[in-house]
Amino acid sequence: MAATLSVEPTGRSCWDEPLSIAVRGLAPEQPVTLRSVLRDEKGALFRAHARYRADSHGELDLARVPALGGSFSGLEPMGLLWAMEPDRPFWRLIKRDVQTPFLVELEVLDGHEPDGGRRLARTVHERHFMAPGVRRVPVREGRVRATLFLPPGQGPFPGIIDVYGVGGGLLEYRAGLVAGHGFATLALAFYDFEDLPKELNVIEVDYFEEAVRYMLRHPKVKGPDIGLLGLSLGADVCLIMASFLNNVSATVSINGSAFSGNRHIKYKQTMIPPLGHDLRRMKVAFSGILDIVDIRNDAVGGCENPSMIPIEKAKGPILFVAGQDDHCWRSELYTQIASDRLQAHGKERPQVLSYPGTGHYIEPPYFPMCPASLHKIVNEAVIWGGEVKAHSKAQIDAWKQILFFFGKHLGSTHSRASCRL
């Protein structure tokens, strides 16, 4: 009897969906190696492997049988995805074209040899970033450069603006996934994209106000308020929007700092000075890669520092997500300062998700952790922190909590079906 490799859902799934992976038709107690391969849009290969032993019936269910070693060990049904590593140094997995899936090749190899034995079974699974029925709408409205993702159905839907960080450009993959959970989600560029400024010297809040107005005017977006979701500098942009603009009722800050870091923040007559940094405080980590965690100037005065974003002005609740091992900056410390500021101004203590062993790039579930990559400011590779397994668990939990937070405060009751057609 030939071995068969099955993946559920069959054929395709959304990237944030868990998979059930099983092998049948093996010999009792047969040692095998499972291997996964993904090629990104720039040609880089991401790989993982794990050694297993079939049960007495010649079957292997990754939800019931622990890995004996390899890229991971223990009971990790999704380890073949989150434990992937790139074949290029300092390379981060990013999906550029959300209209096409990533193809994940899964193989079963005989034995536990490091280079792999005879191939016993193989399958290819599509991992999509838009659930069936989600619509992608490019937005070039006034100055706004963005992409709107609309859930299936008539709507109107609760709205979210999604902002990424210091890399600039327009990243759509998180917004596409969020839309699959019932939210009209705008992936918003704010520099280094098309005719937007190439460099971000001043954060002009007027631009983001225009994006909020666009969302609230859209017939498929349910007002009167929207939510905001941001990572890193994008998280700080979201905190700025929540502090200065009306019609924001829920904000999620993923490893934000709540400070004006290297740029002035300008809104009408208000100007917030940057905290600034000193590159002489860079260190070299044990790995030989630069560590920039301490280059920012000290937040003298704590929550009353003049470079802090006035988050006490935010109308709605803020969910802070922090990696305790973030090496971009000290997210856990900044989150505590932000909490102190809110409470000092008579606000309730905010909800904080603080994850041990978790680095800077907290992505949707099952994205491989990026331990180090090129940083736009220092123009060299820097470490981002995190331990692979802990970081992966944090991504899964944070995603569930973020979706629940938006559902609670924006009024969505949507529950997404599988990505299968």
UniProtKB/Swiss-Prot annotation:
Induction: In the liver, by peroxisome proliferator (Clofibrate) treatment, via the peroxisome proliferator-activated receptors (PPARs) or fasting for 24 hours. The keyword Hydrolase applies. Keywords: Fatty acid metabolism, Hydrolase, Lipid metabolism, Peroxisome, Serine esterase. The keyword Ribonucleoprotein does not apply. It is an enzyme of class 3 (hydrolase). It is found in: Peroxisome. It catalyses: succinyl-CoA + H2O = succinate + CoA + H(+); glutaryl-CoA + H2O = glutarate + CoA + H(+). A motif (Microbody targeting signal) lies at residues 419-421. This is Peroxisomal succinyl-coenzyme A thioesterase. It comes from Mus musculus. The gene is Acot4.
